[in-house]
Amino acid sequence: MKKAFIPVLIVKLLFISSSASFADSPITATDFYEAYRDVKMVQRAHLEGVMGVEIAEFLSSPENPIDVKAAVINAISWRFEGKNNAELYTYYLGLLYHMSITELDTGFLSADEIFCMGYLIAMDNYFQPENAIPLLEEAHKLMKD
């Protein structure tokens, strides 16, 4: 149940904040990673603020719980001008699955990887969180099955 709660919460928050405004977005204004400060990878993500190989490996590992993966992404945070962590994660997934990023689609990815990609997209682009909705909905559907 806990595994599906965070993705559902994030999807609902995206629907609430999908219109671009200058008010704080619940996606970017809620630093829930603070509750996971005892997790080494969360600490690292907060300090680095950018996707690296170790963070990407952590997000793709089936051994790590989805709530901790979400906390890692939340700890990477966002910038008003945008970030490219989703793009960096896509490159990692291409290497992992031995595919070019143009060939990579969600059929090759786990539900957790799809969720991580969606949440990274939402965090990367403050003004267009709706771009993440299709991936988050797909991840949620796969997690329910």
Regions found by a protein language model. Name each.
Residues 1-4:
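Positively charged n-region of N-terminal signal peptides that target proteins for export
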Residues 8-17:
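Bacterial N-terminal signal peptides
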Residues 22-107:
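N-terminal alpha-helical interaction modules that lie
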Residues 63-67, 108-115, 144-145:
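Residue signature of alpha-solenoid helical repeat architecture, marking inter-repeat boundaries
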Residues 76-84, 119-128:
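Short coil/turn linking the two alpha-helices of tandem helical-hairpin repeats
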Residues 107-110, 125-134:
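Alpha-helix boundary/capping segments in eukaryotic regulatory proteins
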Residues 131-145:
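Short secondary-structure subsegments characteristic of cysteine-rich extracellular domains
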